[in-house]
Every structure is written in structure tokens, then in C-alpha cells.
């Protein structure tokens, strides 16, 4: 069945239940329209020995990561995060100093983004650390970006360089923990300001964040929008030239979005002026009955075996 097949089964099972105004499963967050505004909510888990190795990450790094990955989902909807709920399951050896160090950094990052902690839960664990964060965002309903909004002819963009996190994890597993890529892997940076800014731009159509890798995540937009894509390998901003890590590695937490073709150049210029760094044009949306990606390098089509991360 796989991870996404399981999610589809759950969505189908609950389709008959009254959503009370909430939108159904399918985006980085669910959306509740409230007049001209909207609330968005997302949740994400971090499980020891699945998402992190405790002896390879500090409590501070894990606190930052736990919050950042959820803020990234809110940013991908085009609005500002405003609050979180935090639930933790801790074994005895993580209670006390470890938990306090985790909480201090979670608090510091919350303060940086003006995101309140408004609830949660704590419990003991007999088998490792588990962390669950619920993040809430708020903004104009007109700014909400959905995966289903891409149109044929749109330009595909990513919000920064890709592959550093995957290369950092590889360095850690090889015992080389003092590299720039390791620092990126351990301290992900959500594109919060960028997401809110892109949300305000009508020419930006579909958007999501890159958590499982470009090769996997773009397919979510394609299936939701019922179209295909061409990606140009030579234009992908791959860290250290490692294209496979850039498209299949995951945990980059950069924004992936599509833009109306006739407004793309102006958006690029405005983004550069506003943030002092570029966005990267990596492909375009095309017609496709199979909702798949076609890969090109310098105009020559090829068929790589690049797949993003899945849990099942």
C-alpha cells in the first residue's frame, strides 16, 4: 500500500464525515475559511530512530527541528504561523536536563517567529523519544496556496539550494560530523517570511514545502493539479553538484511553487530585491494524463531512478 496509499485510504474513509467547514486532506495544512481570513493547521511527528538518532543530535538541535518542520508547512500555505501545541513522550533518561535544553530552544525559536505555545501533552515512554507538534497559521483567505492550483504553462521554482540536509546525514553516518552540510541537516530553516510573501503574490499558484525530496514532493502537486512537469537537471540548485541528493534526499524545507509564466521574471526580480537572494527556476508544468515528471539535462531527456523518501 505504501505511505501515500495509506493516507489515501484514510481520506476515503473519512470523506463521509461532516468537515464543519474544514477542507479535506491534501495540502501541507488543512484550511478553515473564516470570512476573508483563514486558519490553517498542520501536525508532524519526530520519532527516535526514525527521524533522528539521539546520540547524533543535541536536545537544542531537536527542539529547533521539531518546530521548524511544522512552521515550514504553515509557510507553504502562504500565511504566517501564530501558535503551536507540543506533545512529548520521554523515557526516564530524557527527563530533566535533556528536556529543559529542548524546551529552551523551542521557546527561543517560538519567540523569534512570535509563535505562542498554547497547549500540548506529556507522557512517559518505554522506547525512545517521540515528539508531536501541531502548528496553527492565520492569514488572508486569498493568500492561501494549495497543491491543486498549478496550471499548464506555469514555471516551477524552488526557494533555495537543495541536497545539503541529505549530504549532512550521509556525513553523520560516516562519522564526519563537522561539515557545513551537517549543520544544515541539524538546524533546518523554515522559509517563514518567504512563504508569507509568496502568499501575497497572486501570480504564485501552487505551493508546498520540500520535505521528502523534489522528485517525490512535486508529484503531490502534479496529482492534485492533474498535470505533469518537465524538470531541467542543469537548472536545479544542487549543493556540491550532487543532483541525486538534491532531488531525492529530502528534509530541505525549501518552498516548491509554480508561477504564471508571464509574471515569472517580475517575481524573480521582486524576490531578489526583497530577500537579497534568488529563487531557482527548475522546470515547467505540462499536460500529462499520468501526472508524472519528465527529466531533461541540457535538452536531452533521460530516465533517472530518483525517488524521494517514504515511510512505508
PLM features per residue range, with description:
Residues 1-312:
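Helix-biased detector of long, well-ordered alpha-helical tracts
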